[in-house]
Amino acid sequence: MSDCCSPKGYRWIFSEKRAHAEARRYRRRGLDPTSRRIAELLKQQGVEGRTLLEVGGGIGAIQIELLKAGITRAVNIELTPTYEGAAQTLLRETGLADRVERRVMDFAEATREVEVADIVILNRVLCCYPDMPKLAGAAADHAREVLLVSFPKERWWTRVVISLGDLALRVGRRQFQIFLHAPDKIIATVERHGLKIVSNETSFFWQVASLRRTALAPRSGHA
């Protein structure tokens, strides 16, 4: 991982306090708009009997909704352990703890340790990782059928927001950086790994792309 983003920086941004706040918000309001749209797109394509891998899924809210909709098993991967307490509490509350495996690791650096899944989700993750091609490519390789990825769209206001956020982080001497990876480069990267875009939607800030594999991968094994 780049020197711009240390484990300490990730733990400060994605803290236990933030995790518990997100869990409380999910209990009250359900999924946020971007996450809700991702879940809707996947349900439209069919999730019954499928397996799920989510990289940077946080408290696991999307996983919970998709497990209720028919996903058989889910794996969540986080860079830091700070979300584990809040996530495990939610899983116990929903009775889904035995269907989710949560792992703490740098997915892009340890891809061989993770099995492929029918569906892979990268929701607002690429903007927090310096090496977009490595992470996006690894996610694409692990998607047997479908990859859902969301990222900031490239507009002047997203550049302003991200620049101000980075300035605040530098002033506060936080070892973390926000990245505005070019959307066309993100999509081109995953398409080089055998996926083709089937939908590409935008909101005010976020872009959500759904990509499907052109030739299905084997039902088991590692990427």
Residue positions per predicted region:
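Short alpha-helix
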Residues: 176-194
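Short, glycine-/aromatic-enriched active-site segment of Class I SAM-dependent methyltransferases
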Residues: 158-175
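Class I SAM-dependent methyltransferase SAM/SAH-binding core
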Residues: 59-61, 65-104
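Conserved class I S-adenosyl-L-methionine
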Residues: 1-45, 49-58
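Conserved beta-strand signature within the Rossmann-like core of class I S-adenosyl-L-methionine
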Residues: 144-153
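A short, conserved alpha-helix within the catalytic core of class I
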Residues: 129-139
